[in-house]
Curated annotation (Swiss-Prot):
Activates KDO (a required 8-carbon sugar) for incorporation into bacterial lipopolysaccharide in Gram-negative bacteria. One of its GO terms (molecular function) is 3-deoxy-manno-octulosonate cytidylyltransferase activity. Pathway: Nucleotide-sugar biosynthesis; CMP-3-deoxy-D-manno-octulosonate biosynthesis; CMP-3-deoxy-D-manno-octulosonate from 3-deoxy-D-manno-octulosonate and CTP: step 1/1; Bacterial outer membrane biogenesis; lipopolysaccharide biosynthesis. It is found in: Cytoplasm. The keyword Transferase applies. This is 3-deoxy-manno-octulosonate cytidylyltransferase. It comes from Pseudomonas savastanoi pv. phaseolicola (strain 1448A / Race 6) (Pseudomonas syringae pv. phaseolicola (strain 1448A / Race 6)).
């Protein structure tokens, strides 16, 4: 049985790489609507879109979503989630799942999975997902975040660099993945407890988070454990660029 949880979908209009991204149309609908529809297919008790832009509020209201207007000055999507959790009055132990607003094909099963994993691991303040890396180009791609975990499935660290660095194997050959090293790609979906979100904001960013531009490192820096599991179903990939948008359009529009 899936744990009770709320989904929050952060949707910013002013993306530096792709402004207006949540409202780009795919199969005749704004992208944020497709994300919302996928989240509504999960076991979530409630699905809320969080945005800092009135244009996105208007679009979300038009297709019937619950939407909250948040401040514009948040350092990260997790900071925005903390404001939403406070606005909704969620209990400290309530589970909140962050579904990125640029994942129009996110499988509902992985939304349920990340919530259930957090409920099953009270020692963790967060949970997230990963999948194996089977391509050496992905290992060296800084846009693909790598994760290493301990024997209990708790994150040791995340990095945009190859992680771990197979010293001898990569010194000899960087054209193939080192044999026997279980490289994993982080999938950017998270579940949190609402009380943790309050703590996360109060800590503020750390130098490691700022250096890698990875907000989950703030949690590790402050001693919070992050549970990581392999995704039951691999998400097909989000929309970071106009090229990604065209790829998703081809998939969904036929």
């Amino acid at each position: 049985m899936t744990a009770a949880f709320t989904v929050v979908i952060p949707a910013r209009y002013g993306s530096s790489r792709f402004p207006g991204k949540p409202l780009k149309t795919i199969a005749g609908k704004p992208m944020v609507q497709l994300v919302w529809e996928q989240a509504c297919k999960s076991s979530a008790e409630r699905v809320v879109i969080a945005t800092d832009d009135a244009r996105i509020v208007e679009a979300c209201q038009a297709f019937g979503a619950e939407v909250l207007l948040t401040r514009e000055d948040h350092n990260s999507g997790t900071d925005r989630l903390a404001e939403v959790a406070a606005q909704l009055g969620l209990a400290a132990d309530a589970i909140v799942v962050n579904v990125q607003g640029d994942e129009p094909m996110i499988p509902p099963a992985v939304i349920d999975q990340v919530a259930s994993n957090l409920a099953a691991h009270p020692e963790a303040g967060m949970s997230t997902l990963a999948e194996p890396i089977d391509d050496v180009a992905a290992l060296f791609n800084p846009n693909i975040v790598k994760v290493a975990t301990d024997i209990n499935g708790l994150a040791l660290t995340f990095s945009r660099a190859p992680l771990p660095w197979a010293r001898d194997a990569l010194a000899a050959n960087r054209d193939e993945l080192p044999a026997g090293v279980p490289y994993r790609r982080h999938i950017g979906i998270y579940a949190y407890r609402a009380g943790f979100l309050h703590d996360f904001v109060s800590w503020g960013p750390c130098w490691l988070e700022n250096t890698e531009s990875l907000e989950q490192l703030r949690a590790l820096w402050n001693g919070v454990r992050i549970h990581v599991a392999d995704a039951l179903e691999a998400p097909p990939g989000g929309v970071d660029t106009p090229e990604d948008l065209e790829r998703v359009r081809r998939l969904l529009e036929g």
